Amino acid sequence: AANPHLCGSHLVEALYLVCGERGFFYQPKGIHZZCCHKPCBIFZLZBYCN
């Protein structure tokens, strides 16, 4: 399956799912470049978990 482009609220939702109770730090610029402009995978999302 292809990795989705995640933008805006979809991106935040994905972070909640991946990070769960650990929570995450939301850096719109960095993660937006990585996941909205081009597709990112679950491991890239995990980099933003606390």
From Swiss-Prot:
Keyword Secreted: yes
Annotated TM spans: none
Intracellular or extracellular location(s): Secreted
Subunit structure: Heterodimer of a B chain and an A chain linked by two disulfide bonds.
PANTHER family per the UniProt record, alphabetical: INSULIN, INSULIN/INSULIN GROWTH FACTOR
Record lineage: Eukaryota, Metazoa, Chordata, Craniata, Vertebrata
Originating organism: Katsuwonus pelamis (Skipjack tuna)
Matching Pfam families: Insulin (PF00049)
Disulfide topology: C7-C36, C19-C49, C35-C40
Annotated function: Insulin decreases blood glucose concentration. It increases cell permeability to monosaccharides, amino acids and fatty acids. It accelerates glycolysis, the pentose phosphate cycle, and glycogen synthesis in liver.
Identification of the protein by name: Insulin
Family: Belongs to the insulin family.
GO biological process: glucose metabolic process
UniProt keyword annotation of Secreted present: yes
Keywords assigned by UniProt, alphabetized: Carbohydrate metabolism, Disulfide bond, Glucose metabolism, Hormone, Secreted
Chief place of localization: secreted
CC per GO annotation: extracellular space
Molecular function, one GO term: hormone activity
